[in-house]
């Protein structure tokens, strides 16, 4: 049985990554297709000073996403010792010994090993000795720039969730469990579900968003407005994720809820009165309905 291995961080599993996986599956044909990724992110390990970097795609999500496409995920712990390996050592320990691949598929700008010396040209040379061929997949460009995880991070950090969706090829999602909050939304006439995320994941910028929401075990997406922020009107300092499901009533405590970001409505604001906040929330609901009318929900398994 033939074996094809793709190597990369694959954070975000964006359109560029999907193009690479398409080539990997084509090379594998009916054989085994493996994706090697790393955890934690190399930028966290190699940074001179501590750097927090929440992933775009937590490992459980990455496993599920690839499994649905017939790809096995193999996670290599990223350490300074791993980064110090020569390309030949990396290939022997993490490619040839466990998988004996027939094909290695990487992006055209990919490099591994000490000092990132294992570029495509060197990997092809190593492959001739180790018995595998190398295919490099061109970077995918959109609006004049390469599709990268960095671009997606930048878009989300600015609240540009529609742009992030264009780069990803699907809407950015968060999954969490509904926990008890202080029920401020209920006193304002807009009860919200407070989400505690299952896994560490990058959260878009503070603000109000139009989202599709889905309850665990359901295929149906429900329209919702979401607040990401600290609730400055009430002197908050801790970030909360609050979802108001439109035209829905019920007890959500303890249930899992997934949200898919459609559009950014406005930044988080501090209001001078509860009345002003309530009026703004009413407008948020109107704008949410307008945005979602033109935004068809994606299939539940598309994440």
Predicted regions and their residues:
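Phosphate/ribose-recognition catalytic cores of enzymes acting on nucleotide-derived substrates
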Residues: 181-303
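Residues at the starts of beta-strands that form the adenosine-phosphate
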Residues: 32-34, 72, 102, 133
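ATP-dependent adenylation/nucleotidyltransferase module used to activate substrates
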Residues: 64-67
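Glycine-rich, highly charged phosphate/nucleotide-binding loops
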Residues: 53-62, 83-91
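N-terminal catalytic cores of NTP/NDP-binding nucleotidyl/phosphoryl-transfer enzymes
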Residues: 1-58
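A conserved beta-strand->alpha-helix junction
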Residues: 36-40, 73-82, 138
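Classical nucleotidyltransferase
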Residues: 82-191, 272-280, 302
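A short acidic, helix-capping loop that chelates divalent metal ions and anchors anionic groups
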Residues: 42-48, 109, 146-147, 269
């Amino acid at each position: 049985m033939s074996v094809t291995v793709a190597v990369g961080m694959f954070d975000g599993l964006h359109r560029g990554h999907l193009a690479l996986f398409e080539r990997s599956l084509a090379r594998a044909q009916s054989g085994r297709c493996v994706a090697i990724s790393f955890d934690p992110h190399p930028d966290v390990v190699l940074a001179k000073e501590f750097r927090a970097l929440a992933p775009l795609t937590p490992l459980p999500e990455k496993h599920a996403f690839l499994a649905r496409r017939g790809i096995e995920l193999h996670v290599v712990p990223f350490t300074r010792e791993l980064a110090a390996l020569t390309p030949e050592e990396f290939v022997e320990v993490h490619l040839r010994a466990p998988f004996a691949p027939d094909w290695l598929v990487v992006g055209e700008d990919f490099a591994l090993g000490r000092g990132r010396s294992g570029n495509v040209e060197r990997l092809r040379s190593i492959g001739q000795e180790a018995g595998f061929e190398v295919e490099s997949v061109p970077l995918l460009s959109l609006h004049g720039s390469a599709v990268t995880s960095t671009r997606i991070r930048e878009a989300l950090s600015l609240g540009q969730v529609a742009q992030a969706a264009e780069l990803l090829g699907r809407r950015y999602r968060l999954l969490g469990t509904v926990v008890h909050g202080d029920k401020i939304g209920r006193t304002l006439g807009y009860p919200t579900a407070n989400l505690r995320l299952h896994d560490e994941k990058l959260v878009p910028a503070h603000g109000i968003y139009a989202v599709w929401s889905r309850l665990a075990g359901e295929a149906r997406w429900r329209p919702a407005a979401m607040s990401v922020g600290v609730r400055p009107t009430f002197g908050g300092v801790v970030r909360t994720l609050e979802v108001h499901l439109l035209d829905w009533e019920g007890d959500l405590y303890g249930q899992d809820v997934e949200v898919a970001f459609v559009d950014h409505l406005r930044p988080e604001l501090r209001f001078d009165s509860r009345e002003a906040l309530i009026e703004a929330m009413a407008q948020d609901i109107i704008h949410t309905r307008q945005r979602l009318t033109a935004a068809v929900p994606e299939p539940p398994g598309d994440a």
